[in-house]
Amino acid sequence: EHWARLPIQSTAGARLATLAWGTSVSLLEAFPNCFPQRPYVISISFPEFTSLCPVTGQPDCGTITVEYIPDELCVESKSFKLYMFAFRNHQSFMETITNNVLEDLRALLNPCWCRVKGLFAPRGGTRIHVFAEAFKDGMPEEQSALVRETVRSWKSEPDPHRP
């Protein structure tokens, strides 16, 4: 097999698994990165994200975009889609969702760098955008410099997911 089913070991994945809305969201699928020697960015955008406001119970809609530089593993896109759909009936703040997605992907993939952008549609006249990112700890200095340069270059490019 060129990919493996890997359970998320983080507490963030466990939180989702204990919500018991009938869907298995504690597993994401990953496959080996064929180019671990080269820092490159993978960007996945999910424009149909929905969850529920924990205060009002009203739906929150938006786009979740994940950008990461893989190390040994890459996330499989169908499993990511199913993971995103699992939030549909989950009540949580937008800031919490964005950070939980980051931590779940870090636990699964251990990427060199990962950023999650939660671009939520306005509700009550207020638009909320949440950005959370992290670099892998303990990278050799040369690799870290190359990864940071790749990230800097990537961030200077126009957003590929905006029309």
Q: What do these predicted regions represent?
A:
Residues 2-163:
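N-terminal intrinsically disordered, cationic/polar leader segments
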